[in-house]
Amino acid sequence: MKFGLKFVAASVALVCAQGAFAQSGETVKLVRIDPLTGLLGPVGVNQDKSYKFFAEKFSGAGNPAGVKFEFTTIDNKLSPTESLNALKAAIDQGVRYIIQGNGSSVALALSDAITKHNERNPGKEVIFLNDSAVDPDLTNSKCSFWHFRFDADTSMKIEAMTTFMKDQKDIQKVYILGQNYSHGVQVAKFAKENLARKRPDIQVVGEDLHPLAQVRDFAPYIAKIKASGADTVITGNWGSDLSLLVKAANENGYTGKFFTYYAGVTGTPAALGTNGAGRVYQIAYNHYNMGGQMDKWMTEFKTKYNDDFYTGSVIRVYQTLGAAMAKAKSTDPVKVALAMEGLKFNSFNGEVEMRKTDHQLQQPLYMSVWQKADKKYPYSPENTGMTLAPVKEFANYVSSTPTSCQMKRP
């Protein structure tokens, strides 16, 4: 398995050669609408740093269009209503590129609002760049020409996760725990469907949804998991809802496996500590030991911010925008959106493609496991002495799932 992938710009350069530097020096404003406060605020703060860090890396000569990226975040307090107010404020200030990711309920509201705005305001169109919200509806029943997703959606992650789990013969009883909004509901739905198809002998012995970013003590949930006899937990929880969950598991003696999306995200590595070694897994488009240029950037990021870079979608957002703007020879959102469709290039995790039919990025995924950092996998998040080490790479075709999207194009 090849995990140390190098950045290769050749494919982007070939696609964009004639458009290179067509907008050289032009400033492109990007606004991210996500939480910076509250229990899930630390994740948003980390990602705000990430976008600012890579805005410098990918501005000017760092992208084939030669544009300058200017980035800021508006705190939406994880509220769809606050997000719509922030969207209006950004549009009124002339922003045409909106980023969001933390919370599919917010993403669905923004996608709908942006689509309606664009229909009513020709010439003032806005593009929605979704870096993390993984509800499959966003690229299926509720797909929009103006929405582009850079993370793998839940159907893709669960496809890869259960492909790995089906060969783990010690997994017999599974408990599914999630946040009570569209994301948690979809994780449970796809987990049950995929397990039934690939390992019908596995019993789903319990299922729970809890309020988003409100639970401070998960001990009662751990008690239910233990009482069910589950040897494995599947959860799409993120931020404090995952860090407090694994903390409660450690404190209350639960020794089963956890299959997660976000074990490497702010707060969870510290909550895990040296516990969970060999038992906590993460399915994602990256991990902490990708090698090559990514290692250099992560080291530089940690030196600058005393924090860990983990939202790799940030890099692909900048890569895709730069390539599409060069190809379109324009920063006009309509032309850029059309140029983004079907765009292929090599990123930190290999060749990726923005699928034209639904605007879902097709990409490799990795299963990694929590273990002690060593010479081969040295990066230690939150200075824990531990790391997420890759155990399986899934090529694009493995995790790719079909779409029902019937997209209306301009």
Over which residues does each language-model region extend?
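Solvent-exposed, acidic/polar segments of extracytosolic/periplasmic ligand-binding ectodomains
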Residues: V28, F348-P410
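Periplasmic-binding protein-like
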Residues: A90-S104, N121-D131, K173-G178, G229-G239, ...
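Extracellular/periplasmic periplasmic-binding protein-like sensory domains
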Residues: S144, V246-V317, A326-T331, N383-R409
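Signal peptide-proximal N-terminal region
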Residues: S24-G25, K49-F71, A196-D201
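Beta-alpha junction/loop-to-helix N-cap segments that form part of ligand/metal-binding clefts
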Residues: T27, P42-N46, A61-L138, F150, ...
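Extracellular/periplasmic Venus flytrap/periplasmic-binding protein
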Residues: E82-N85, P136-D137, F145-G253, Y288-K296
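Gram-negative bacterial Sec-dependent N-terminal signal peptides
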Residues: M1-A22
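Extracytoplasmic "Venus flytrap"
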Residues: T27-K52, I74-T81, N102-G103, L177-Q186, ...
